[in-house]
From Swiss-Prot:
Source organism superkingdom: Bacteria
Gene3D superfamilies: 3.30.1370.110, P-loop containing nucleotide triphosphate hydrolases
Molecular function, one GO term: mismatched DNA binding
Biological process, per Gene Ontology: mismatch repair; negative regulation of DNA recombination; rescue of stalled ribosome
Domain Smr: 711-786
InterPro entries per the UniProt record, alphabetical: DNA_mismatch_repair_MutS_C, DNA_mismatch_repair_MutS_core, DNA_mismatch_repair_MutS_sf, MSSS, MutS, MutS2, P-loop_NTPase, Smr_dom
Assigned EC number: 3.1.-.-, 3.6.4.-
Stated name of the protein: Endonuclease MutS2
Amino acid sequence: MLERTLRVLEYNKVKEQLLEHTASSLGRDKVKNLVPSTDFEEIVELQETTDEAAKVIRLKGHVPLGGISDIRANIKRAKIGSMLSPHELIEIASTMYGSRQMKRFIDDMIDNGVELPILETHVAQIVSLYDLEKKITNCIGDGGEVVDSASDKLRGIRNQIRTAESRIREKLENMTRSSNAQKMLSDAIVTIRNERYVIPVKQEYRGVYGGIVHDQSASGQTLFIEPQVIVELNNALQEARVKEKQEVERILMMLTEEVAVEADIVLSNVEVVANLDFIFAKALYAKRIKATKPIVNNERYMDLKQARHPLIDPEIIVPNNIMLGKDFTTIVITGPNTGGKTVTLKTVGICVLMAQSGLHIPVMDESEICVFKNIFADIGDEQSIEQNLSTFSSHMVNIVDILEKADFESLVLFDELGAGTDPQEGAALAISILDEVCNRGARVVATTHYPELKAYGYNREQVINASVEFDVNTLSPTYKLLIGVPGRSNAFEISKRLGLSDRVIDRARNHISTDTNKIENMIAKLEESQKNAERERKEAEEHRKQSEKLHRELQRQIIEFNDERDEKLLKAQKEGEEKVEAAKQEAEGIIQELRQLRKAQLINVKDHELIEAKSRLEGAAPELVKKQKVNVKNTAPKQQLRSGDEVKVLTFGQKGQLLEKVSDTEWSVQIGILKMKVKESNMEYINTPKQTEKKAVASVKGRDYHVSLELDLRGERYEDAMMRVEKYLDDAQLASYPRVSIIHGKGTGALRQGVQDYLKKHRGVKTYRYGDMGEGGLGVTVVELK
């Protein structure tokens, strides 16, 4: 990409704004080195990466990139054996922490179901060095000092230092508080000179304290003396400080060596977080300028919807729709110089540069942009004083360079093509230059104020005229781009509004040819038609938005109604269940008491009578409870859905008809007068197949004992066997068994006959039969219960 193109399209100003959103010097370096890519696959991935970061910003509002520094120089010093300072080690630990936090932040979002495949790949490269990070922070405090707990030896040395300092101060303070101190000392203080404790003694009393003179005042009247009584203590203190320094250096060197061991991993982590800082800076910048991800195509056309220039306040700029490459390959914007044509030109250029840099662009959703190998721009007045070139010559030098390099993979932007020379010759050159570039297959946007180029757009198939709308009432451009309408000067209308007499204006009109007047009138009518069409489009758009709003409101009300209904039904169901459960518990208690009384032969109540009473109680359960049970039982497996099937939309509780499948997981469903997209997970096929009968479970609900699926009577006396059969059938029916087996053996047949005679009379028995070959044959009776 030509440096001149980046400069005239103000690409570096965009980078300056992007820099404001980086969190570290690492990210800032990435921004400074940013240039547009020309590789299609790379650009698509860059856009997807920025979009993932933008998703994170939308969901979380921030990213934990604090504490990250450019520690690469520190790591290199550690690798060559130089001892790192406490501050440098703290920077390394802080960056390790920041890397670890960033990895955890993204991983947590992914664990919560947020899809971030590209960012996941980035953070997967971060290797946690938690042990080394903690070792550094345990040895070095926030202020950059090596703490006492860094080693037992250091703690002991510092205790010695504190003890020595305390003893020295105590002795010196006793001296300063003595009765003679006021006379012999300049001030009753203890101070330090040359790292040794001293007191300020008047010159004439220097011999009183003995010791060593370390300094004197500017006047020479005061000497800073280390009294003889503390010389040995000061010597001991200095020795301890030397030991302290040696131990601190040993600890720092130990930490440096451990950093050197992990140097490659640390540098790799730094590169990852540098990229993450850069990626999230792009996402934050997109949020700032209200930008979106464009669709990147490789088919050499662009469709920018409501495009804005990123460096102009979005509150004041007028967005424009700009299409290029499908129906036409060249746009020629004509009209007066004050109409904002250059802004439109720069908007196209900067949007392409941003998109190819992986930046989102200030356009509406669904905008498309293509990849250009080269972008050429001849914009602005760049006269070269050194080369003694005029405006025209300066432009022509640039145009010659463009014509040498432009091809079918190029975007060419011309501002005021052919300006700066004789209008007739300039217009002719402009037409010839445009023909040359268009014939090479390049995509071109050109601005001009030459009226001759208005006809150019009508004489070439791949060229279309455009203009920037001008409001003659306010005498100012609206900056609205009108595709298909050539510009006009509006000189007569402006002059009239400014007070020029009609006589002068009419005379001026007579100097213009009839054909020119016709063309101007035709353009005026085209502008009016364009305005009317745009107004009608806006009205239709407003009606559409209102319809969508009403549709959303109706959906919301339906959902609220269904939620409220379901809430009330659930509440009623719960209350009913609680009442029925209470009654069941009470009935269970009564049945147990009656059985106890029967065992004690105080009353005569049959178990099947108790069963019937319990069945009547269960029959009193609310319909809602039964319905809920049925729904749970009849949950059908997922059906193969087809267009025309009737389904139930679970969110609304409404029936609907499938129209068409719009994606892998969504269908278009007609629900009454509404048509909406519904996920398969939110619908239920109405014609659910019948469920196979559930197998009985071998436990009695609400009881504290187990009931077997078979009763073995072999070896029992007849009377005892009959009592067991009666009890067993009652328990099996309470357990809701559909079928049981009674083993009586073949023997003489008396027990078998007695069992079957009893079964004939029992009201809970539906049918009975001998067992099949695999069930025990004549030695077993299989009983079907009601």
